[in-house]
Amino acid sequence: MPLIVFVIALLALFAIELMEPVQIWVIQPFTAAIAKVSAVVSQTFDSTVHAQGIVLGNIETGAAVSIQPGCNGVEAMIVLLAAILATPAGWKHKLIGIGLGFLAIQIVNVIRIVSLFYLLQWDPVWFEWAHLYLWQALIMLDGLIVYLLWVRMLPMVGDDPSSRAGDSP
Protein backbone atom coordinates (compact mmCIF):
# COMPACT_ATOMS: atom_id res chain seq x y z
CA MET A 1 0.00 0.00 0.00
CA PRO A 2 2.75 2.57 0.77
CA LEU A 3 4.19 2.06 -2.74
CA ILE A 4 0.80 2.82 -4.31
CA VAL A 5 0.42 5.94 -2.15
CA PHE A 6 3.97 7.00 -3.11
CA VAL A 7 3.34 6.61 -6.85
CA ILE A 8 -0.05 8.36 -6.72
CA ALA A 9 1.35 11.22 -4.60
CA LEU A 10 4.37 11.54 -6.89
CA LEU A 11 2.26 11.68 -10.05
CA ALA A 12 -0.25 14.08 -8.50
CA LEU A 13 2.42 16.44 -7.14
CA PHE A 14 4.32 16.51 -10.45
CA ALA A 15 1.05 17.14 -12.33
CA ILE A 16 0.18 19.99 -9.95
CA GLU A 17 3.67 21.47 -10.31
CA LEU A 18 3.33 21.55 -14.10
CA MET A 19 0.01 23.43 -14.08
CA GLU A 20 0.40 26.93 -15.50
CA PRO A 21 -1.21 28.76 -12.54
CA VAL A 22 1.07 26.89 -10.11
CA GLN A 23 4.09 27.76 -12.25
CA ILE A 24 3.12 31.44 -12.38
CA TRP A 25 1.98 31.96 -8.79
CA VAL A 26 4.17 29.50 -6.87
CA ILE A 27 7.14 28.05 -8.75
CA GLN A 28 8.43 31.18 -10.50
CA PRO A 29 8.25 33.41 -7.38
CA PHE A 30 9.82 30.62 -5.33
CA THR A 31 12.64 30.26 -7.88
CA ALA A 32 13.19 34.03 -7.84
CA ALA A 33 13.42 33.87 -4.04
CA ILE A 34 16.04 31.10 -4.32
CA ALA A 35 18.02 33.33 -6.72
CA LYS A 36 17.78 36.21 -4.23
CA VAL A 37 18.94 34.02 -1.33
CA SER A 38 21.82 32.74 -3.49
CA ALA A 39 22.80 36.34 -4.27
CA VAL A 40 22.69 37.32 -0.59
CA VAL A 41 24.90 34.35 0.30
CA SER A 42 27.33 35.24 -2.51
CA GLN A 43 27.40 38.91 -1.48
CA THR A 44 28.94 37.94 1.85
CA PHE A 45 32.20 37.47 -0.09
CA ASP A 46 31.51 39.00 -3.54
CA SER A 47 29.76 42.36 -3.81
CA THR A 48 29.45 42.09 -7.61
CA VAL A 49 26.74 39.41 -7.46
CA HIS A 50 23.08 40.29 -7.90
CA ALA A 51 19.80 38.55 -8.60
CA GLN A 52 17.18 39.67 -11.06
CA GLY A 53 14.18 37.38 -11.21
CA ILE A 54 15.49 33.84 -11.67
CA VAL A 55 18.93 35.00 -12.85
CA LEU A 56 22.01 35.14 -10.63
CA GLY A 57 24.59 37.39 -12.25
CA ASN A 58 27.88 39.21 -11.87
CA ILE A 59 27.63 42.96 -12.47
CA GLU A 60 31.28 43.30 -13.58
CA THR A 61 31.78 40.26 -15.81
CA GLY A 62 28.24 39.75 -17.08
CA ALA A 63 28.43 36.06 -16.19
CA ALA A 64 25.04 34.71 -15.18
CA VAL A 65 23.10 31.56 -14.48
CA SER A 66 19.37 31.23 -14.90
CA ILE A 67 17.67 28.97 -12.37
CA GLN A 68 15.43 26.90 -14.59
CA PRO A 69 12.82 24.26 -13.69
CA GLY A 70 14.63 21.28 -12.26
CA CYS A 71 17.29 23.52 -10.73
CA ASN A 72 15.19 25.01 -7.94
CA GLY A 73 14.97 21.94 -5.72
CA VAL A 74 11.23 21.56 -6.26
CA GLU A 75 11.50 18.14 -7.92
CA ALA A 76 13.65 16.75 -5.08
CA MET A 77 11.15 18.16 -2.60
CA ILE A 78 8.27 16.52 -4.49
CA VAL A 79 9.97 13.12 -4.30
CA LEU A 80 10.66 13.59 -0.57
CA LEU A 81 7.10 14.80 0.06
CA ALA A 82 5.62 11.78 -1.73
CA ALA A 83 7.86 9.42 0.25
CA ILE A 84 6.91 11.04 3.57
CA LEU A 85 3.20 11.00 2.71
CA ALA A 86 3.43 7.30 1.81
CA THR A 87 5.20 6.34 5.03
CA PRO A 88 2.94 5.25 7.91
CA ALA A 89 3.43 7.94 10.55
CA GLY A 90 1.42 10.55 12.41
CA TRP A 91 0.80 13.93 10.83
CA LYS A 92 2.94 15.69 13.42
CA HIS A 93 5.94 13.58 12.39
CA LYS A 94 5.13 14.00 8.70
CA LEU A 95 4.99 17.80 9.02
CA ILE A 96 8.31 17.83 10.88
CA GLY A 97 9.87 15.70 8.14
CA ILE A 98 8.47 17.91 5.39
CA GLY A 99 9.67 21.10 7.09
CA LEU A 100 13.16 19.83 7.88
CA GLY A 101 13.40 18.19 4.46
CA PHE A 102 12.48 21.45 2.74
CA LEU A 103 15.20 23.28 4.68
CA ALA A 104 17.82 20.61 4.03
CA ILE A 105 17.10 20.43 0.31
CA GLN A 106 17.06 24.21 -0.13
CA ILE A 107 20.25 24.75 1.87
CA VAL A 108 22.05 22.24 -0.34
CA ASN A 109 20.39 23.78 -3.40
CA VAL A 110 21.67 27.27 -2.56
CA ILE A 111 25.16 25.82 -2.13
CA ARG A 112 24.66 24.11 -5.49
CA ILE A 113 23.56 27.30 -7.26
CA VAL A 114 26.37 29.42 -5.81
CA SER A 115 29.01 26.79 -6.61
CA LEU A 116 27.72 26.38 -10.17
CA PHE A 117 27.67 30.16 -10.64
CA TYR A 118 31.37 30.38 -9.81
CA LEU A 119 32.21 27.15 -11.64
CA LEU A 120 30.67 28.60 -14.82
CA GLN A 121 32.99 31.59 -14.57
CA TRP A 122 36.00 29.35 -14.00
CA ASP A 123 35.41 26.64 -16.62
CA PRO A 124 32.18 26.13 -18.61
CA VAL A 125 33.04 22.47 -19.35
CA TRP A 126 33.32 21.65 -15.66
CA PHE A 127 30.14 23.66 -15.06
CA GLU A 128 28.23 21.45 -17.52
CA TRP A 129 29.55 18.26 -15.96
CA ALA A 130 28.86 19.38 -12.39
CA HIS A 131 25.44 20.73 -13.33
CA LEU A 132 24.22 17.72 -15.29
CA TYR A 133 25.77 14.88 -13.31
CA LEU A 134 27.26 15.75 -9.94
CA TRP A 135 24.71 18.16 -8.46
CA GLN A 136 21.64 16.41 -9.86
CA ALA A 137 22.67 13.26 -8.04
CA LEU A 138 23.67 15.12 -4.86
CA ILE A 139 20.32 16.92 -4.56
CA MET A 140 18.42 13.63 -4.86
CA LEU A 141 20.88 11.99 -2.46
CA ASP A 142 20.19 14.83 -0.02
CA GLY A 143 16.46 14.05 -0.24
CA LEU A 144 17.12 10.35 0.31
CA ILE A 145 19.34 11.01 3.34
CA VAL A 146 16.74 13.35 4.84
CA TYR A 147 14.07 10.69 4.31
CA LEU A 148 16.18 7.95 5.91
CA LEU A 149 17.04 10.16 8.90
CA TRP A 150 13.37 11.08 9.26
CA VAL A 151 12.30 7.41 9.16
CA ARG A 152 14.93 6.61 11.76
CA MET A 153 13.56 9.24 14.15
CA LEU A 154 9.99 7.93 13.88
CA PRO A 155 8.70 6.17 16.98
CA MET A 156 8.51 2.40 16.69
CA VAL A 157 5.03 0.97 16.16
CA GLY A 158 3.65 0.10 19.57
CA ASP A 159 6.34 2.20 21.25
CA ASP A 160 4.74 3.12 24.55
CA PRO A 161 6.97 5.40 26.63
CA SER A 162 5.62 3.89 29.86
CA SER A 163 6.77 0.40 28.83
CA ARG A 164 10.45 1.33 28.43
CA ALA A 165 13.02 -0.20 30.75
CA GLY A 166 13.48 1.84 33.89
CA ASP A 167 10.06 3.47 33.61
CA SER A 168 8.10 0.66 35.23
CA PRO A 169 7.55 0.64 39.01
Regions found by a protein language model. Name each.
Residues 1-169:
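Hydrophobic N-terminal alpha-helices or hydrophobic patches in metabolic proteins across all domains
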